């Protein structure tokens, strides 16, 4: 069974754990740097990206997260997690982890009161996935090596680049675990490649 970590500094941690377990993988809440070595993949949950960055800096997680990103192990960023993975953020000089060749705009769908749900078609996942958008970012631009998995209107809301997956919405806030299951499969495939 693959072990999937959920960065446990802030955000919808418990919901991600439930979704990982429902997808047939073992979930580990990552609160210490050394736990990164024990896991096969990592979820960066939604939350408030500036608060999350402050906590990442406080607990000296940034370099270990960048090292993890270079290790070939899959990472999945949802909402604020997408912001952490992006190489370019509109209105900001520097990226956070900066692992994905995407440009992201923060709070692009508006403030908290503008939160909404939308039925999405997601490549590799299926139709009618209910995306929960809460002060969500979206992808403005992608490099050629990034696959766009889903759009809401003309806005890119789910993307994949090699072992990295990012979504504007919160897949863990519904009982539909297909997006998490898709990531679990990515982790299994990456682990199999390492064995071979």
Swiss-Prot record:
EC number: 4.3.3.6, 3.5.1.2
Catalytic reaction list: aldehydo-D-ribose 5-phosphate + D-glyceraldehyde 3-phosphate + L-glutamine = pyridoxal 5'-phosphate + L-glutamate + phosphate + 3 H2O + H(+); L-glutamine + H2O = L-glutamate + NH4(+)
Lineage: Bacteria, Bacillati, Bacillota, Bacilli, Bacillales
Residues reported in the UniProt entry to bind L-glutamine: 47-49, 106, 134-135
Cellular component aspect of the GO annotation: cytosol; glutaminase complex
Disulfide bond residue pairs: none
Subunit structure and binding partners: In the presence of PdxS, forms a dodecamer of heterodimers. Only shows activity in the heterodimer.
Family stated for the protein in its record: Belongs to the glutaminase PdxT/SNO family.
Known pathway: Cofactor biosynthesis; pyridoxal 5'-phosphate biosynthesis
GO BP: glutamine catabolic process; pyridoxal phosphate biosynthetic process; pyridoxine metabolic process
UniProt-recorded name of the protein: Pyridoxal 5'-phosphate synthase subunit PdxT
Function summary: Catalyzes the hydrolysis of glutamine to glutamate and ammonia as part of the biosynthesis of pyridoxal 5'-phosphate. The resulting ammonia molecule is channeled to the active site of PdxS.
Lyase among keywords: yes
Active site feature: 79, 170, 172
Keywords: Glutamine amidotransferase, Hydrolase, Lyase, Pyridoxal phosphate
GO molecular function: glutaminase activity; pyridoxal 5'-phosphate synthase (glutamine hydrolysing) activity
InterPro entries in the cross-refs: Class_I_gatase-like (IPR029062), PdxT/SNO (IPR002161), PdxT/SNO_CS (IPR021196)
């Amino acid at each position: 069974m693959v072990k999937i970590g959920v960065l446990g500094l802030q955000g919808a941690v418990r919901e991600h754990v439930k979704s990982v377990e429902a997808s047939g993988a073992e979930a580990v809440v990552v609160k210490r740097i050394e736990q990164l070595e024990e896991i096969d993949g990592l979820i960066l949950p939604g939350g408030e990206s500036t608060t999350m960055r402050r906590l990442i800096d406080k607990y000296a997680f940034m370099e270990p997260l960048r090292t993890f990103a270079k290790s070939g192990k899959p990472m999945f960023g949802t909402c604020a997690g997408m912001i952490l993975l992006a190489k370019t953020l509109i209105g900001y000089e520097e990226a956070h982890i900066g692992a994905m060749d995407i440009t992201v705009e923060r709070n692009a769908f508006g403030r908290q009161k503008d939160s909404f749900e939308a039925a999405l078609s997601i490549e590799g996942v299926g139709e009618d996935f209910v995306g929960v958008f809460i002060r969500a970012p979206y992808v403005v631009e992608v490099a050629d090596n990034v696959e766009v998995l889903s759009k809401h209107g003309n806005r890119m809301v789910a993307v994949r680049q090699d072992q990295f997956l990012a979504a504007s919405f919160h897949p863990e806030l519904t009982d539909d675990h297909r997006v998490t299951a898709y990531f679990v499969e990515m982790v299994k495939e990456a682990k199999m490649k390492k064995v071979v």
